[in-house]
Amino acid sequence: NIGKSIKLKDFLFTDRFKGIAEDIRQKSTPDERHEYKKTKVHEIPAITISGLFNVRESKGLVSPSGLMCIDIDHKDNTPEIMAKVPSILKSLPYVCYSAKSISGDGYFAIVPIENPYHLRQHYLALEEEMKSYGITIDKSCKDITRLRFATYDDEYYYNPFASSFYLEVDITQPLDRKQSNQFVSSSTHSDEDRV
Protein backbone atom coordinates (compact mmCIF):
# COMPACT_ATOMS: atom_id res chain seq x y z
CA ASN A 1 0.00 0.00 0.00
CA ILE A 2 1.26 3.44 -0.94
CA GLY A 3 0.29 6.07 1.58
CA LYS A 4 -0.29 9.76 1.12
CA SER A 5 0.34 12.82 3.22
CA ILE A 6 -2.69 14.46 4.87
CA LYS A 7 -3.19 17.20 7.42
CA LEU A 8 -3.64 15.74 10.89
CA LYS A 9 -6.65 17.97 11.57
CA ASP A 10 -8.41 16.47 8.52
CA PHE A 11 -7.88 13.01 10.03
CA LEU A 12 -8.94 13.91 13.59
CA PHE A 13 -11.79 16.39 13.12
CA THR A 14 -14.20 14.43 10.95
CA ASP A 15 -17.34 12.37 11.39
CA ARG A 16 -16.59 10.20 8.33
CA PHE A 17 -15.99 7.15 10.54
CA LYS A 18 -18.99 7.61 12.82
CA GLY A 19 -20.95 4.76 11.19
CA ILE A 20 -18.13 2.22 11.44
CA ALA A 21 -17.34 3.29 15.01
CA GLU A 22 -20.98 2.90 16.05
CA ASP A 23 -21.22 -0.53 14.35
CA ILE A 24 -18.11 -1.74 16.19
CA ARG A 25 -19.20 -0.30 19.55
CA GLN A 26 -22.60 -2.04 19.35
CA LYS A 27 -20.95 -5.44 19.77
CA SER A 28 -21.45 -6.86 23.28
CA THR A 29 -17.92 -7.59 24.47
CA PRO A 30 -14.42 -6.22 23.88
CA ASP A 31 -13.49 -9.50 22.15
CA GLU A 32 -16.47 -9.23 19.79
CA ARG A 33 -15.59 -5.59 19.05
CA HIS A 34 -11.97 -6.54 18.36
CA GLU A 35 -12.95 -9.37 16.00
CA TYR A 36 -15.49 -7.20 14.16
CA LYS A 37 -12.92 -4.40 13.83
CA LYS A 38 -10.55 -6.87 12.13
CA THR A 39 -13.20 -7.52 9.45
CA LYS A 40 -13.55 -3.77 8.85
CA VAL A 41 -9.86 -2.86 8.95
CA HIS A 42 -9.73 -2.28 5.17
CA GLU A 43 -12.40 0.43 5.60
CA ILE A 44 -10.61 2.26 8.42
CA PRO A 45 -7.72 4.48 7.36
CA ALA A 46 -4.63 4.71 9.54
CA ILE A 47 -1.79 7.21 9.75
CA THR A 48 1.60 7.52 11.40
CA ILE A 49 1.16 10.33 13.94
CA SER A 50 4.87 10.66 14.76
CA GLY A 51 6.24 11.27 11.30
CA LEU A 52 6.16 11.29 7.54
CA PHE A 53 7.73 8.19 5.96
CA ASN A 54 8.65 7.15 2.44
CA VAL A 55 8.50 3.54 3.71
CA ARG A 56 6.84 2.67 7.04
CA GLU A 57 9.98 1.68 8.91
CA SER A 58 12.38 3.67 11.08
CA LYS A 59 14.93 4.21 8.32
CA GLY A 60 12.15 5.41 6.02
CA LEU A 61 11.49 8.48 8.20
CA VAL A 62 11.43 11.63 6.06
CA SER A 63 10.56 14.04 8.86
CA PRO A 64 9.26 13.63 12.40
CA SER A 65 6.04 15.44 13.32
CA GLY A 66 7.06 16.37 16.85
CA LEU A 67 4.04 14.44 18.12
CA MET A 68 3.77 11.20 20.08
CA CYS A 69 0.57 9.18 20.28
CA ILE A 70 -0.17 6.98 23.28
CA ASP A 71 -2.85 4.31 23.67
CA ILE A 72 -4.63 3.52 26.92
CA ASP A 73 -6.41 0.17 26.62
CA HIS A 74 -9.02 -1.52 28.80
CA LYS A 75 -6.98 -4.74 28.82
CA ASP A 76 -4.10 -3.00 30.64
CA ASN A 77 -6.16 -0.90 33.07
CA THR A 78 -8.97 -1.45 35.58
CA PRO A 79 -12.51 -0.22 34.83
CA GLU A 80 -12.08 2.33 37.65
CA ILE A 81 -8.97 3.77 36.00
CA MET A 82 -10.57 3.75 32.54
CA ALA A 83 -13.48 5.79 33.89
CA LYS A 84 -11.00 8.47 35.04
CA VAL A 85 -8.84 8.54 31.89
CA PRO A 86 -10.71 11.31 29.99
CA SER A 87 -10.59 13.74 32.91
CA ILE A 88 -6.93 12.92 33.65
CA LEU A 89 -5.92 13.49 30.02
CA LYS A 90 -7.81 16.80 29.94
CA SER A 91 -5.95 17.96 33.05
CA LEU A 92 -2.48 17.45 31.56
CA PRO A 93 -0.96 20.57 29.96
CA TYR A 94 0.93 18.57 27.33
CA VAL A 95 -2.04 16.64 25.88
CA CYS A 96 -3.19 18.41 22.72
CA TYR A 97 -5.82 15.86 21.64
CA SER A 98 -7.52 12.81 23.10
CA ALA A 99 -10.43 10.64 22.04
CA LYS A 100 -11.94 7.16 22.29
CA SER A 101 -10.49 4.45 20.10
CA ILE A 102 -12.72 3.19 17.31
CA SER A 103 -13.82 0.21 19.42
CA GLY A 104 -14.76 2.53 22.29
CA ASP A 105 -12.77 0.30 24.67
CA GLY A 106 -9.77 2.58 25.01
CA TYR A 107 -8.44 6.07 24.53
CA PHE A 108 -5.54 7.66 22.75
CA ALA A 109 -3.78 10.94 23.33
CA ILE A 110 -1.50 13.03 21.17
CA VAL A 111 1.36 14.78 22.94
CA PRO A 112 3.81 17.31 21.44
CA ILE A 113 7.38 16.37 22.35
CA GLU A 114 10.42 18.61 22.59
CA ASN A 115 12.86 16.43 20.65
CA PRO A 116 11.08 14.31 18.02
CA TYR A 117 14.21 12.31 17.20
CA HIS A 118 14.10 10.85 20.71
CA LEU A 119 10.54 9.55 20.77
CA ARG A 120 11.45 6.40 22.70
CA GLN A 121 12.98 8.37 25.59
CA HIS A 122 9.97 10.67 25.71
CA TYR A 123 7.72 7.60 25.72
CA LEU A 124 9.59 6.09 28.69
CA ALA A 125 9.29 9.32 30.67
CA LEU A 126 5.60 9.67 29.83
CA GLU A 127 5.04 6.02 30.75
CA GLU A 128 6.38 6.81 34.25
CA GLU A 129 4.23 9.95 34.47
CA MET A 130 1.09 7.98 33.55
CA LYS A 131 1.93 5.36 36.19
CA SER A 132 1.69 8.12 38.80
CA TYR A 133 -2.01 8.37 37.82
CA GLY A 134 -2.41 4.58 37.90
CA ILE A 135 -2.54 4.43 34.08
CA THR A 136 -0.68 1.85 31.99
CA ILE A 137 0.00 2.93 28.41
CA ASP A 138 0.54 0.56 25.49
CA LYS A 139 4.25 -0.27 25.15
CA SER A 140 4.09 -0.44 21.36
CA CYS A 141 3.55 3.33 21.25
CA LYS A 142 7.29 3.92 21.56
CA ASP A 143 7.59 2.79 17.92
CA ILE A 144 7.82 5.88 15.70
CA THR A 145 6.18 3.94 12.82
CA ARG A 146 3.11 3.02 14.89
CA LEU A 147 -0.22 3.38 13.09
CA ARG A 148 -3.20 5.22 14.51
CA PHE A 149 -6.56 4.09 13.15
CA ALA A 150 -9.23 6.67 12.45
CA THR A 151 -12.03 6.94 14.98
CA TYR A 152 -15.08 8.93 15.95
CA ASP A 153 -15.69 10.54 19.32
CA ASP A 154 -18.12 13.44 19.67
CA GLU A 155 -16.59 14.17 23.09
CA TYR A 156 -12.97 14.42 21.92
CA TYR A 157 -10.63 16.82 23.75
CA TYR A 158 -8.54 19.39 21.91
CA ASN A 159 -6.06 21.90 23.34
CA PRO A 160 -4.34 23.94 20.60
CA PHE A 161 -2.15 25.56 23.27
CA ALA A 162 -0.71 22.33 24.68
CA SER A 163 2.84 22.53 25.94
CA SER A 164 5.61 20.22 24.75
CA PHE A 165 6.61 17.29 26.90
CA TYR A 166 10.37 17.03 27.24
CA LEU A 167 13.08 15.46 29.33
CA GLU A 168 15.43 17.17 31.74
CA VAL A 169 18.07 14.52 31.06
CA ASP A 170 20.78 14.78 28.40
CA ILE A 171 19.07 12.92 25.57
CA THR A 172 22.37 12.50 23.74
CA GLN A 173 23.24 9.97 26.46
CA PRO A 174 21.50 6.60 26.96
CA LEU A 175 18.42 7.07 29.12
CA ASP A 176 18.72 5.65 32.62
CA ARG A 177 15.35 4.21 33.74
CA LYS A 178 15.81 5.89 37.13
CA GLN A 179 15.87 9.28 35.39
CA SER A 180 13.01 8.56 33.03
CA ASN A 181 10.42 10.35 35.15
CA GLN A 182 12.36 13.60 35.21
CA PHE A 183 10.41 15.71 32.77
CA VAL A 184 8.95 19.13 32.39
CA SER A 185 6.39 20.50 30.02
CA SER A 186 6.84 23.84 28.36
CA SER A 187 7.00 25.57 24.98
CA THR A 188 3.36 26.50 24.54
CA HIS A 189 2.17 26.14 20.95
CA SER A 190 -0.83 27.62 19.19
CA ASP A 191 -0.05 26.54 15.64
CA GLU A 192 -3.26 24.90 14.42
CA ASP A 193 -1.45 23.20 11.52
CA ARG A 194 0.41 21.17 14.11
CA VAL A 195 -2.86 19.35 14.78
Region roles according to the model:
Residues 77-94:
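Short amphipathic alpha-helix segments
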